[in-house]
């Protein structure tokens, strides 16, 4: 191939068209042929080194097929040599063939390694859309503190009423499998994922816009908060299904990296919302925060266009598939899914641990009463409560680290036993804050509240991680996503029931927005009630998490 390069430089077809004399042409041909033979002799005297191919400029071109390369080389040779050098060209064919069997590395391979990655996941438009949806779910906590102050200060509700509205707002999280059935079986405008993300974002923006400008009663507030919760729950199911689809067929490291990206995006959004939630409420008011929150779900609608999804078509005709909630196909599919789901849940090895999770979550709590006490009695400002919320968001990550570092190898029964007992004892420290004993110890109310929230949140998150691991273990092969969503819905149902029971106890003890005489008794009773499920620890599996697969450790760490 080197000889061809030299030959093409010394002879050009254009040289034969401008000379008037035939003798000169013959003389030039003879000189050129002689110089060509000499150059080939010099090349043959060199060692048989295949590295000579490095001087050829052809490897810079895209390498597609050997036939294309041969055609390209032959065309260059014919142009360079004309009709007078066929013999010499044939003599060089073997060298060309040997060089062509060692193609240079493809440039496309280097491009993939230079793409941006985060948590080990390539930041393709599709993955960016998934991460942004999880980020929005985390940052929507911006309105949580504003809702609490709105119900307390603007609508003048008692702690019990606030607890009821908070519990009702969690109802959409109890039917998450239904959203999965709808998304899988009923394409909207030809898409199963993209359209529902757009719709969820618009629904969330609509609900928070109503909260920002039109809501003026507890009933309308409860309705709008319920709509906002529905939008988040539906988008959560849709994006979870997208993650499952992308993780299917991938290696464990890729699946774990994708889960880490989702969890990291949600946690980052939660920390951002915690940092700004209190200061925005104090500086601009709750209506302004609701207006800002109304813009956030639109991010979900906007990034939905980045989702890589094929339009659903009918296999036979190729026309767009049009299925409604009342169509026979959807009803039949839903019926089959429900039968299959119930067949899995009623198995003793699934039903009994699920029953324990529900009862463990269904114990009453006094969160609403404590919020009223800290704001109306202790005078905690929205900005300070926002800082406390920031601390608890970081503490939640510390709780996950505590579980991953020290508790993964501990049997499940022992984890629930130890964390429940310690949580009950540490929960009693709220009585110190209510009684003011911390001030006698020289600790201010603010610092005691921060420290108490930090410790309790770390322990609560560490104790909740086994619930996620257990739920993942209970899911049989083939219906992991559906059954996991069902188990999380049952867990959320227990939490809602606990909140409603706490509201009833708050009302029974006569705790109002200005009267906190029995708050210490309520705190003690709620903490002691968390010990009630312990005799049922025998419902849990006996084995240790050492037997778990690595996939169980990659469960998405979301309490919702």
UniProtKB/Swiss-Prot annotation:
Membrane-topology annotation of the record: Multi-pass membrane protein
Gene Ontology biological process: methotrexate transport
Location relative to the cell: Plastid, Chloroplast membrane; Plastid membrane
InterPro entries xrefs: BT1, FBT, MFS_trans_sf
Primary residence: plastid
Superkingdom as given in the UniProt entry: Eukaryota
Disulfide bridge partners, by residue number: none
Transit peptide: 1-30
A Pfam cross-reference name: BT1
Tissues with expression: Constitutively expressed at low level.
Region (Disordered): 82-110
Name assigned to this protein: Folate-biopterin transporter 1, chloroplastic
């Amino acid at each position: 191939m080197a000889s061809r390069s030299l030959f093409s430089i010394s002879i050009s077809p254009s040289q034969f068209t401008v000379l008037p004399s035939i003798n000169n042409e013959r003389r030039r041909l003879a000189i050129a042929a002689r110089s060509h033979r000499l150059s080939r002799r010099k090349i043959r005297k060199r060692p048989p080194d295949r590295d000579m191919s490095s001087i050829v400029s052809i490897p810079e071109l895209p390498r597609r097929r050997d036939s294309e390369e041969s055609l390209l080389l032959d065309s260059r040779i014919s142009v360079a040599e004309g009709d007078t050098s066929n013999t010499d060209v044939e003599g060089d064919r073997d060298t060309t063939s040997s060089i062509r069997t060692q193609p240079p590395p493809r440039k496309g391979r280097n491009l993939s390694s230079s793409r941006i990655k985060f948590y080990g996941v390539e930041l393709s438009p599709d993955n960016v859309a998934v991460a942004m949806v999880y980020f929005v779910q985390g940052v929507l906590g911006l309105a949580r503190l504003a809702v609490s102050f709105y119900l307390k200060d603007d609508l003048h509700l008692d702690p019990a009423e606030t607890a009821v509205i908070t519990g009702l707002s969690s109802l959409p999280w109890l039917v998450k499998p239904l959203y999965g059935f709808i998304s899988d079986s009923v394409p909207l405008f030809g898409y199963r994922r993209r359209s529902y993300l757009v719709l969820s974002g618009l629904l969330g923006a609509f609900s928070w816009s109503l909260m920002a400008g039109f809501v003026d009663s507890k009933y309308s507030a409860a309705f709008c908060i319920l709509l906002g919760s529905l939008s988040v729950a539906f988008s959560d199911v849709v994006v979870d299904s997208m993650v499952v689809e992308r993780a299917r067929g991938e290696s464990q490291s890729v699946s774990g990296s994708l889960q880490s990206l989702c969890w990291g995006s949600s946690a980052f959004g939660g920390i951002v919302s915690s940092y700004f939630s209190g200061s925005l409420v104090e500086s601009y008011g709750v209506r302004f925060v609701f207006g800002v929150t109304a813009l956030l779900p639109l991010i979900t609608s906007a990034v939905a266009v980045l989702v890589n999804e094929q339009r659903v078509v009918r296999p036979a005709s190729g026309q767009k598939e049009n299925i409604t909630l009342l169509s026979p196909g959807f009803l039949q599919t839903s019926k089959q899914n429900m039968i299959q789901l119930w067949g899995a849940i009623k198995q003793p090895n699934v039903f009994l641990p699920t029953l324990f999770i529900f009862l463990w979550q269904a114990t009453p709590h006094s969160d609403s009463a404590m919020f009223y006490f800290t704001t109306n009695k202790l005078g905690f400002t929205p900005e300070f409560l926002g800082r406390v919320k920031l601390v608890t968001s970081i503490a939640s990550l510390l709780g996950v680290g505590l579980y991953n570092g020290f508790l993964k190898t501990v049997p499940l029964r022992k984890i629930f036993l130890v964390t429940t007992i310690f949580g009950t004892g540490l929960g009693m420290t709220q009585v110190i804050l209510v009684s003011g004993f911390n001030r006698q110890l020289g600790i201010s109310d603010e610092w005691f509240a921060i420290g108490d929230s930090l410790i309790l949140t770390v322990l609560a998150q560490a104790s909740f991680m086994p619930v996620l691991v257990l739920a993942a273990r209970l899911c049989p092969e083939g219906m992991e996503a559906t059954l996991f969503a069902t188990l999380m819905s049952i867990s959320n149902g227990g939490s809602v029931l606990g909140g409603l029971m706490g509201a009833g106890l708050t009302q029974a003890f006569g705790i109002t927005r200005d009267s906190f005489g029995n708050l210490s008794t309520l705190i003690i009773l709620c903490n002691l009630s968390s010990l009630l499920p312990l005799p049922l620890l025998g419902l849990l599996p006996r084995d240790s998490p050492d037997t778990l697969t690595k996939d169980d450790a990659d469960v998405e760490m979301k309490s919702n």
